[in-house]
Amino acid sequence: MMMSNACLYLETIIRPHMKTFFRAMLTAFALLPSMASHAQIANDHTVLSTPWNAYWIAPPNDPGRECGVYYFRKALDLSAKPSTFNVKVSADNRYKLYVNGTLVSVGPARGDTYYWNYETVDLAPYLNTGKNSIAAIVWNEAESRPEAQISLRTAFIVQGNTANEEILNTDNSWKCLQDKGYAAITGIGYPTYYVAGPGELVDMNKSIKNWMTTDFDDHAWPDAEELDHGKPKGMSDAFGWMLVPSAIPQMERTLQRIPVLRKADGITLPAGFPATQTAVLIPANTTVTLLLDQTYLTSAYVRLNFSGGKGAAMSLMYAEALFDNLKQFGSRKGNRNDVEGKDFAGRRDSIISDGTPGQSFNTLYWRTFRYIRLRVQTKDDPLTIDDLYGTFTGYPFKLNAKFQSDNPEIQKILDIGWRTARLDAMETYMDCPYYEQLQYIGDTRIQAMVSYYNSGDDRLARNAINLMDHSRIAEGLTLSRHPSYSPQIIPTFSLWYVGVLHDYWMYRPDSNFVKDKLPGIRDILSFFSRYQQADGSLKNVPYWNFIDWAGNGSHDYSHPPTGKNGGSSIMDMQLMMAYQWAAEMEKRMGMPAMAILYKEKADQLEKTIHINYWDAAKGLYADNEDKDLFSQHANSLAILSGLVKGQEATSVAKKMLADSTLTQCTIYFKYYLHQALVKAGLGDGYLDWLDIWRKNIAMGLTTWAEISDLPHARSDCHAWGASPNVEFYRTVLGIDSYAPGFSKIRIEPHLGALTNVSGEMPHPNGKVAVSYKKRGGAWKISITLPEITSGILVWKGKTYPLKAGENLF
């Protein structure tokens, strides 16, 4: 039965002339020994190690790869309300699961077919004695789907945890019907790299209403089609979706009203709209355009309730900011608060009214916006807007860090940074929520550090590390971003992945998790070793070796500048740092021989880099062996890697600040620049280095832009710019890890002109709290460490021991 079902499934997704081949392959696979499931949950072993009794189900007679929205329903009669009712749920592309009309789960968390996530949900709180309805909306955006959405075909699955709950297992007793009222709207109205999915066109005349309610009559719906049993990852014949439990919680969903109306053309609106639920009557044969302002960037599911208006067309368009003049200046943006004389373009949804009362449009997926433009064109029937609001969504991070000072600017920077970090964290970290929604390693390194310092929740970071590890290709490199259905390779991001893992090792108490990833690190470094010359330097490394969105007029640093011999100091320094990190981890929990090898390679690079790139006349490292290009990037890495130390490092750091001819780091790479300046002894100047963040604020941004050229920044929300949310705690308050797992704490504040500052941050054992107050010429210092944790205070050149609990100086 298992084999025939597998073949039936394959018949739905492969060309007919391939069936014989795959049947033969399945027979061969059946002879292989069964592998252990990748994870286990208490009292849940069976559904993790054997085929599920539930089937993947699909719309009947549907090819499975076309754009469409589908409803699945199952009636459930219960003699008593259960205390628990746990089920596992997944779908391709995505689902929303309802019990008796209440939304209970959204997913699946993004992954790939080798690690396809399912959510475990307790339905008991939503079930009643007697009749119940279990309903799901499943959608497939096909070729229009987001770049981050990997897919096989339209499908849905529910598996009960125990025999009592298996009554809900998906099979052909479930009903399924396509909603013919949906179509995709592609494009955002201007040329740019946009891969975050389509908008929706919903014709309410064709759409199915109230499909999730208990009393909905689905008797005429066809039965769902059974594909194949669900297969946990690791089974001998697992193919298609290899099911694994989601490692992250459900996303937050919180009501969020839109507070401000900026413009209204064609109508006079009643007071209160849209900040409160206020009905707006739009007369027949009228065109109305409303510009709504959330006042800050957000990500939310958008809901529009309306009545009447037979044949009326409504359009919701979403934008981070308005444009100066798209035809004349392209996507140039000015102050993000300005709307007069501006152009509006962006992702959009469109709705056609069927004229009945109580209609509702809910976006399938969340939208990112500060501004919404609502345009309504009525025909012969007036239309009433009953309500318009959002439901904020994001990874459920909690802010567990505090910073108090007499400088209100610091709190504003922290608030904007935290908003940026939250909007760039959903089921994965993302580079940006509006345009890409992709988890890039270079971005993720900084985002994970923000999570450690501000929240202490490391689940999304662990998930990111796992996804990066899963993405490795045969050559050894990670993909630059994952999940992503279009492979992109940035070797320099694979080197930053070594840093991501080293960061996790230093700040989180789970060395076994890190140890499990060391084979992947070896593969990455093995790849780079193939391009190392006799002296250790790199040459002709393939793919896209991205450094930063920086430039100096003669060179674009999205690729490293190389000299006549093909050398790049930046790449050599990154490789050297990766060897250093890997050597530390191998020495403590891996293979000692590899630790020795990596240290030797790092030492060789140290000598080679100094010979090839050091310019004695300038007292700086050049970007290439021709010594005709110099940057903050190369010299930041020189300090961080230990190429220069002590007074020499201080000299290099001062020149980086003073010499404007050096290629300047953008907001992204300032994460490394600022660490280098601190390491070189200039940390008391940290507050003087924040001009780009101040410019963002002055330009009306409520999140940090992608690049430092604010008028031409594509994305207004890139969390790689949220590094102050690390450095106000690590640099200013001085709290840092002093041993793997944050098992020891180093406190070395850099207060600059601040004389009254305090704060706290989460720690694996509790929290770290510090207070620095200057009275006259004397300082009062209080440092509280969590239980079973010790550390040191470095203050004015002296070192003092710290114990768990309160330490006063």
Report each predicted region and the residues it spans.
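Extracellular/oxidizing-compartment recognition motifs
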Residues: 40-431, 443, 459-460, 464, ...
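Non-catalytic C-terminal accessory modules of carbohydrate-active enzymes
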Residues: 187, 192-210, 271-273, 600, ...
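Bacterial Sec-dependent N-terminal signal peptides
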Residues: 1-43
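Active-site acid/base region of carbohydrate-active enzymes
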Residues: 169-179, 185, 371, 379-416, ...
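Solvent-exposed loop and edge beta-strand segments that line ligand/cofactor-binding
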Residues: 291-294, 362, 428-441, 482-494, ...
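Alpha-helical repeat scaffolds
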Residues: 649-656, 687-689
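Alpha-helical support elements that line or immediately flank enzyme active sites
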Residues: 301-320, 372-377, 442-471, 501-508, ...
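Well-ordered alpha-helical segments within folded domains of soluble proteins
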Residues: 441-452, 461-462, 491-503, 568-584, ...
